[in-house]
From Swiss-Prot:
InterPro entries in alphabetical order: SMIM19
Top-level taxon of the source organism: Eukaryota
Protease is among the record's keywords: no
Source organism of the structure: Homo sapiens
Family note: Belongs to the SMIM19 family.
Protein name per its UniProtKB record: Small integral membrane protein 19
GO cellular component term of the entry, any: membrane
Major subcellular location class: membrane
Membrane topology: Single-pass membrane protein
Keywords of the record: Membrane, Transmembrane, Transmembrane helix
Family annotation (Pfam families): UPF0697 (PF15117)
Transmembrane domains' residue ranges: 25-43
UniProt entry tagged with the keyword Transmembrane: yes
UniProt subcellular location: Membrane
């Protein structure tokens, strides 16, 4: 072989500078792959914490706007309280001495 283009030297030994460069390059790639895999697993486990860091804080306009589900639950609670008060008023208007009874007849 002529010149320094080949892997083998003049005495038949392997040029170790090429192998050292190859080993360093593969070690760097291996480290990059392992670090990126570790970061991916961390991001997968702590998704909410990471999203909280990058989320924009809410403005005053969105704070004044009520949450839809909170509004629904408050409306439902108000309806239940109104029905309860109506039933209590109805119970107090009925005389207490009359017992509700149902008569069944078999024919």
């Amino acid at each position: 072989m002529a010149g320094g283009y080949g892997v083998m030297g003049d005495d038949g030994s392997i040029d170790y500078t090429v192998h050292e460069a190859w080993n360093e390059a593969t070690n760097v790639y291996l480290i990059v792959i392992l670090v990126s895999f570790g970061l991916f697993m961390y991001a997968k486990r702590n998704k909410r914490r990471i999203m909280r860091i990058f989320s924009v804080p809410p403005t005053e306009e969105t704070l004044s706007e009520p949450n839809f589900y909170d509004t629904i639950s408050k409306i439902r609670l108000r309806q239940q309280l109104e029905m309860y008060s109506i039933s209590r008023k109805y119970d107090y208007q009925q005389p207490q001495n009359q017992a509700d009874s149902v008569q069944l007849s078999l024919e």
